[in-house]
């Protein structure tokens, strides 16, 4: 290998390393260890227009991120996987423990988590605003999602996720 090729390779590797530090690229794959969606490996893709039922990776914003971390649900910096259940213009209600979207019951909230700790509560109906999403894993009764923290900014979504390999019972 010539000196010029060696120098070019060294510069290329160095530039790639610096780019990963400076640009903080998003991960291409996410390992999900939560039972809210099937445990396994998911591929992260850029978000397009959101669709109801689409599975997305979300970086919890503050103060939610701190709440999740302090209570041992999810460390800061770890994305959570949730399904889009309502888009801007749709009406989401929590009446007692029942969650509904556009007058269709989609699931139940709980008063307490698996350790007996009280969960956040909200009540009433609200229209999802521009730049917001209602995220809820309706297939999992134990999912910590919009049942408790209501709407999230769409900007918190870091990508769509597609299963690569999952462990389903």
Task: Give the residues covered by each predicted segment.
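Residues that act as N-cap/strand-start positions at coil-to-secondary-structure junctions
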Residues: 36, 78-80, 86, 119-122
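Acidic/glycine-rich C-terminal interaction modules and beta/coil loop segments
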Residues: 109-112, 118-161, 165-168
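Protein maturation boundaries and topogenic segments
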Residues: 1-79, 127, 150-169
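Surface loops and adjacent helix of pleckstrin homology
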Residues: 47, 61, 97, 104, ...
